[in-house]
From Swiss-Prot:
It comes from Bacillus subtilis (strain 168). InterPro entries: DNA_heli_DnaB-like_N_sf, DNA_helicase_DnaB-like_C, DNA_helicase_N/primase_C, P-loop_NTPase. Gene3D superfamilies: DNAb Helicase, Chain A (1.10.860.10), P-loop containing nucleotide triphosphate hydrolases (3.40.50.300). GO terms for biological process: DNA replication. One of its GO terms (cellular component) is cytosol. GO terms for molecular function: ATP binding; DNA helicase activity. This is SPbeta prophage-derived uncharacterized protein YorI. The gene is yorI.
Length: 504
């Protein structure tokens, strides 16, 4: 079994001696997967849970008492003489050497991961070596290698394979100045600016929704991922929108073709959202039929607008990448769609089967989500479309939100690497108590309306504004947005130059 028993003893023993190691999650990322033995995994699980539940001293009594509630785990613990083992590793552990043994532990975890994916790990660590001198040489070389160096070695193998078998016409090489004047001319004729998002502030920050760009806007369950996408699509494609301030219908200068691909909501649910946005009448009133006569006229007019607009709704409940591509291709060819909203990046039974079959190995959910993100970016380029998608958030978001900590890719469900494939990425959350207190001086000036949502922008490739927070007031009933102001990560007011985009 690929493991370093000495490293495991030292890591577990050091945690027993100094449980605060577990609080340094930014420095030490230890999980049950780092321990291939079920016994060691159970022991770490118990120690970690006890610490995070407030236990300050970890010992055999606490751990034994905790595991008694879990019959299977408790049996494994006692079959391996867990109480004696705890006493032994506490005596052997040297906390001062924890960093060294932690790195050894993680390197072996990485090797098991690569081995499980089908990679040949013998050139990094060969357990089959018999000659003591060869073993010593290998161990010496292995000790010198960092995790990043091991990862780079495998990344280079993948690059070599891609170059050997690549047939895509997208891969080209040019001299640095080739076509540069034509490029400048194209910027003069048509600046690299897209069409508006539903938020004017986000439009300015991202330079609009641009073709061949992949944006990610993640949120919590029920946080409005689909609602925001429908609103964006209507902002671009509805022929008219009702202006409640002017109390009149206003012609929409944008007449783009868009499609919203939903994996959960039925077409009828997307339609009621669209009616609410176009008419500015709250959706719940439409669904409950509690609208007055004036609102009824607005909704009926919105229905006519929706019928005349180039907005297309698709429902893919159990999807795979091929089905997503077919749906996009159909809309591009048949409906001239250039703006795609896919709700949202998550695993399904079909996609698990498809990805595992193609790779030849059983992939984890985080690996599948990363591959999906990569594929979606590829579809943007292939079909020359803009794409917006989303993910759920992982279980750590709420604590960070409550504490007013920085919200970034670390809180994406599955893998923060999903954002690596995007051109812009953000997380939208309700205004927290910490943020409300922090912006109180800004609101007291009396120049800005009070927000109820914050969009945490943590990636914005090729643009001026990165790692900023956009405070907005969003009416979740009709998805009309009023931008309030923008701050840096310290909630200090910053000025974002408004980008005026004109149709045509």
């Amino acid at each position: 079994m690929l493991q370093d028993k000495q490293a495991i003893i030292q890591v577990l023993g050091s945690i027993l001696k100094d449980p605060t190691i577990l609080s340094e999650s930014n420095k030490y990322k230890i999980t049950s997967d780092d321990f291939p033995s079920r016994f060691h995994s159970i022991l770490f699980f118990a120690m970690s849970n006890l610490f995070h539940q407030g236990t300050e001293v970890l010992n055999d009594v606490e751990i034994d008492g905790y595991l008694k509630d879990y019959d299977i785990q408790y049996k494994i613990f006692h079959d391996n003489k867990g109480l004696e083992y705890i006493e032994k590793i506490q005596e052997l552990a040297v906390v001062e050497n924890f960093d060294y043994h932690y790195k050894r532990l993680k390197k072996f975890s990485l090797l098991r991961e690569m081995d499980g994916l089908g990679f040949d790990i013998k050139e990094i660590y060969d357990e089959s070596l018999i000659d003591p001198k060869e073993q010593e040489k290998m161990q010496e070389q292995f000790d010198k290698k960092s995790i990043d160096e091991i990862l780079t070695a495998y990344e280079m193998k993948i690059v070599d394979i891609k170059e050997k078998f690549r047939t895509s016409s997208e891969s080209v090489g040019i001299q640095g100045g080739e076509g540069i004047n034509e490029l400048l001319d194209s910027f003069e004729e048509s600046p690299d600016i897209g069409v508006p998002l539903n938020s004017e502030m986000l439009t300015s920050i991202f330079r609009g929704s641009r073709k061949k760009k992949f944006y990610l806007r993640s949120s919590i369950t029920g946080g409005g991922k689909t609602r925001n996408m429908v609103a964006d699509a209507c902002r671009l494609s509805a022929t008219e929108l009702y202006d409640p301030k002017k109390k009149e219908w206003v012609s929409n200068p944008w007449s783009e073709s868009s499609t919203v691909i939903s994996t959960e909501m039925m077409a009828e649910e997307l339609q009621s959202l669209a009616l609410a946005y176009i008419s500015s009448v709250e959706e719940k009133k439409i669904l409950r039929n509690t609208i007055n006569e004036k609102e009824k006229q607005l909704v009926r007019k919105a229905a006519k607008v929706l019928q005349e607009s180039n907005i297309w709704f698709e429902h893919l409940p159990d999807f795979n990448i091929q089905e997503i591509e077919r749906t996009i291709e159909k809309n591009v060819i048949k409906n001239n769609v250039e703006y795609v909203y896919f709700d949202y990046i998550h695993s399904s039974v079909t996609i698990f089967s498809e990805m595992s079959k193609k790779s030849g190995v059983n992939l984890r959910e985080d690996q599948i989500l990363l591959l999906m993100s990569d594929k979606l970016k590829g579809l943007c380029n292939k079909y020359d479309v803009y794409m917006m998608s989303a993910t759920q958030l992982n279980g750590d978001w709420k604590e960070a939100w409550l504490k007013g900590q920085v919200i970034d890719a670390s809180y994406l469900r599955g893998s923060k690497a999903i954002a690596d494939k995007t051109d812009a990425a953000m997380i939208i959350l309700p205004l927290s108590k910490k943020e409300k207190d922090a912006i109180d001086p800004i609101l007291k000036e009396g120049f800005y309306p009070e927000p109820n949502f914050v969009t945490h922008v943590f990636k914005n490739r090729g643009n001026e504004y990165d790692k900023v927070k956009v405070f907005s007031h969003i009416n979740m009933g009709n998805m009309r947005i009023k931008d309030c102001f923008t701050t840096n990560l310290d909630n200090e007011l910053i000025t974002v130059e408004k980008l005026n985009i004109k149709a045509g």
